[in-house]
Amino acid sequence: MPFRSLLTAAVIATLPLTISSCSTSQAASNQATTTNAGITLTAAQKAKVGRKIWQNESGGKVDGLTHWNHGEDFASLGIGHALWFPAGADEKFIETFPMLMAYMRDRGVKYPAWMGPENDCPWPNRAAFMRDFRSPKMNELRQFLERTVPYQTDFIILRQQAAKAKILRAAPAAERDTINARWNALTATPEGMFALIDYSNFKGEGTNPAERYQGQGWGILQVLQEMKGTPQGRAAASEFADAAVRVLARRVRLAPPARKESRWTAGWNNRVQRYKQAL
């Protein structure tokens, strides 16, 4: 599919490319530090982030690496549930599995031809996917995803880091240096890196003007603005969690009454408070 190949190449080109990549066996022993525009995580720390993402998305189970949600028209694959569309799918979401495969291909990872970034998802719908769940083809896909967790983690981190420029552009000019410093403090620890990744999946980047109640957003940008000071180390993730609680409380307060968003407050708070836990 030429358009998919062009789109995938264009998106991959926007990612920072100086993060270290390694084979699965190297990942266990490589203690070199990744240094990329604020990312200073060792291979061991990145492994913790990857395990937490996998745990968060699918309980850390191998079966959870191949998933298809009820009511959706695409597969969700890998530790971060990258989306793979079958032929003819017309989705508002970004198809990320071909991007992931292109990323791994460019780093010398070998994979079965049918998984290549130019290909559509071979299962046309959820029913076909579930019928094939224990098939040799699906098992091959799961085994590949299980052994490439380090690459998936790098890809997710890079996509998150690529959002930084967008968030800074959306921030008031007078606040950019402070927001940049807070971002860098977060990405220097596995807890902070996970907090940014999870909150982005949870409530977005905060850069979309349409995602506002009474002019106030609730994404990463707003949480970074709400943080107090510029704490370092694990204190950065802890303050990010507290700031997120305040931002989400403001969202509930400003939401249209008919939405009754207060019913979600406890669950939201429980989720962000976990950012304080050591990985």
Predicted regions and their residues:
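Bacterial N-terminal signal peptides
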Residues: 9-18
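Cell-wall polysaccharide-cleaving catalytic domain and substrate-binding groove, primarily
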Residues: 32-279
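Boundary at the C-terminal end of the N-terminal hydrophobic targeting segment
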Residues: 25-29
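Bacterial N-terminal signal peptides that target proteins for export
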Residues: 1-9
